[in-house]
């Protein structure tokens, strides 16, 4: 039955490889298209008329002309940038706490850029009407402001009055992080009823700089009717538009690996929302937007509605805070924690907790690995004992196989009777591997998708735990003046992982079958090349886990 154990282990390893291959190379199934049968055609036509121009790239606009438009400066601990008073558009935003790369003079990460720039990306909220006679603020409106600077300590109040005397007031606040709150108020001083709808949109010119991988979602995203909706850029490009009619919209936005721009509408109403793609004059634009039902404002009445814009880094604790504070459903799922969300997030919490004490995520990984190892010690102990018993039973198993080679039913019956007599579980040796698979994936996800791990250093030459080991043995770890091709980037940590894996195998019971024993000996070498490009933080975890397993195996061999 030793053959069965080895086959099971090999199957697990193969499954691990297939899962990673699937994550990287197989496009996820097309999501089930939402049925839109209750949309009001009038509202849809209105939205197309009012928002169509916002999807199209700006034409005939000169940068110098844009620079002459007055702006409100944004200044906080986390953000710098400005809001255009023309159209009240959030189109200039820089994240002060994050650099684009690790170089000394690296610029800060820019999130939003004006519509006439190469990387156009902006957000806005406003009002539209189904009556052309109603004069509302639009993209050409120049707003009046009581301040030139928006900060957490100082909100900005804006106003505009149309020719009928209707006053439009907007108050914008920003917190110390990445959340803007926009309150719009209409004071109907006219003698007519005003039908209005509030809307919000995020528009982006997107050019892929690297091949998309299925292990990470990037593109339109949102929580609609308490369900997470994710569409890649390619999905929306193929569909042209994905519509959701009269829904509860907690938030919609566009997500990158580490950054998120999101609209959070007022909870007083349901909204129609869309994920759109448009190609105009060779420029690809993606847009997410929402629009409310018609609200009738009678003469002499006021109407107010509040919306929020999140634009910044996807910090776990920050998204959790906003989700709880403003009841924003599934807001933390903007971070793609993946299949093992129920494990991945607690693993991150554990790492972040110890980081608060040791100040280094690499050390935090070592501590969490020790805790996981202690939790599984009893299971691993039983596993090693079972493997040893299986090795001792191998001669008797071979005898039974020879005796009943022509009768498979009797063969299986006799082998199971032997296991029962000797009190051996043939799959017990594989249980620790099965348990560690979701833990492995969870740690990988934490390293790959969380902003906290981005550019997080360890010691020595490791400056970014989320990136692969930058060294390689093929240029003697930097001593020789050339850079090998990417498939030969076999760094120090991948080598250490392979060595510790080899030593762990040496201390474990060897398969009785010589051929299988030879195959298992090649596994460290296979894994060396297979995982050399993975985040070095994962290799630190794996190497340290192997070292702890060696210590554990030594303890079991000595005292049992």
Swiss-Prot record:
The keyword Cell inner membrane applies. GO terms for cellular component: plasma membrane. Keywords: Cell inner membrane, Cell membrane, Chaperone, Membrane, Protein transport, Transmembrane, Transmembrane helix, Transport. GO terms for molecular function: membrane insertase activity. It is a multi-pass membrane protein. The chain crosses the membrane at residues 5-25, 334-354, 357-377, 431-451, 476-496, 522-542. InterPro entries: Membr_insert_YidC, Membr_insert_YidC_N, YidC/ALB3/OXA1/COX18, YidC/Oxa/ALB_C, YidC_ALB_C, YidC_periplasmic_sf. It is found in: Cell inner membrane. GO terms for biological process: protein insertion into membrane; protein transport. Pfam families: 60KD_IMP, YidC_periplas. Interacts with the Sec translocase complex via SecD. Specifically interacts with transmembrane segments of nascent integral membrane proteins during membrane integration. Belongs to the OXA1/ALB3/YidC family. Type 1 subfamily. Required for the insertion and/or proper folding and/or complex formation of integral membrane proteins into the membrane. Involved in integration of membrane proteins that insert both dependently and independently of the Sec translocase complex, as well as at least some lipoproteins. Aids folding of multispanning membrane proteins. This is Membrane protein insertase YidC. It comes from Rickettsia conorii (strain ATCC VR-613 / Malish 7).
């Amino acid at each position: 039955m030793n053959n069965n154990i080895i086959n099971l282990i090999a199957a697990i390893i193969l499954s691990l490889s297939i899962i990673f291959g699937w994550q990287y190379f197989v496009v996820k199934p097309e999501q089930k298209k939402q049925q839109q049968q209750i949309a009001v055609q009038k509202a849809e036509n209105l939205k197309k008329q009012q928002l169509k121009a916002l999807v199209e790239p700006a034409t005939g606009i000169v940068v110098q002309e844009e620079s002459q438009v007055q702006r409100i400066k944004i200044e906080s601990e986390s953000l710098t940038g400005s809001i255009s008073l023309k159209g009240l558009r959030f189109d200039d935003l820089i994240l002060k706490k994050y650099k684009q790369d690790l170089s000394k003079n690296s610029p800060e990460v820019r999130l939003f850029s004006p519509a006439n720039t190469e990387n156009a990306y902006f957000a806005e909220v406003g009002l539209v009407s189904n009556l052309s006679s109603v004069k509302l603020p639009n993209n050409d409106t120049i707003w009046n402001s009581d301040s030139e600077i928006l900060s957490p300590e100082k909100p900005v109040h804006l106003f505009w009055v149309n020719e009928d005397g209707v006053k439009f007031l907007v108050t914008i606040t920003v917190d110390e992080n990445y959340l803007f709150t926009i309150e719009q108020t209409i004071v109907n001083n006219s003698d007519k009823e005003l039908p209005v709808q509030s809307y919000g949109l995020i528009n982006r010119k997107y050019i892929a700089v690297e091949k998309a991988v299925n292990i990470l979602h990037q593109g339109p995203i949102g929580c609609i009717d308490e369900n997470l909706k994710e569409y890649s850029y390619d999905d929306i490009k193929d569909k042209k538009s994905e519509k959701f009619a009269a829904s509860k919209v907690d938030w919609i936005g566009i997500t990158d690996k580490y950054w998120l721009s999101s609209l959070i509408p007022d909870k007083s109403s349901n909204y129609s929302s869309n994920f759109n793609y448009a190609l105009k004059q060779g420029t690809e634009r993606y847009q997410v937007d929402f629009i409310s039902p018609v609200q009738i404002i009678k003469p002499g009445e006021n109407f107010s509605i509040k919306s929020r814009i999140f634009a910044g880094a996807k910090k776990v604790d920050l998204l959790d805070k906003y989700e709880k504070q403003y009841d924003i459903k599934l807001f933390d799922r903007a971070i793609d924690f993946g299949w093992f969300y129920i494990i991945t997030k607690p693993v991150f919490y554990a790492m972040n907790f110890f980081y608060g004490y040791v100040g280094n995520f690499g050390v935090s990984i070592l501590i969490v690995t020790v805790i996981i190892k202690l939790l599984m010690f009893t299971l691993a102990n039983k596993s090693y004992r079972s493997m040893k018993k299986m090795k001792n039973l191998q001669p008797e198993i071979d005898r039974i196989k020879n005796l009943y080679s022509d009768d498979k039913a009797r063969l299986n019956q006799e082998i199971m009777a032997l296991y029962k007599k000797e009190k051996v579980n043939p799959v017990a040796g594989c249980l620790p591997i099965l348990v560690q698979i979701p833990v492995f994936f969870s740690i990988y996800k934490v390293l790959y998708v969380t902003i906290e791990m981005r550019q997080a250093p360890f010691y020595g030459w490791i400056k970014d735990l989320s990136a692969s080991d930058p060294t390689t043995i093929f240029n003697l770890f930097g001593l020789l003046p050339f850079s090998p091709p990417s498939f030969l980037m076999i760094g120090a940590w991948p080598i250490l992982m392979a060595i510790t894996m080899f030593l762990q195998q040496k201390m474990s019971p060897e398969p009785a079958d010589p051929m299988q024993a030879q195959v298992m000996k090649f596994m460290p070498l296979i894994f060396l090349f297979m995982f050399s490009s993975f985040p070095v933080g994962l290799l630190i975890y794996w190497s340290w886990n192997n070292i702890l397993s060696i210590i554990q195996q030594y303890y079991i061999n000595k005292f049992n």
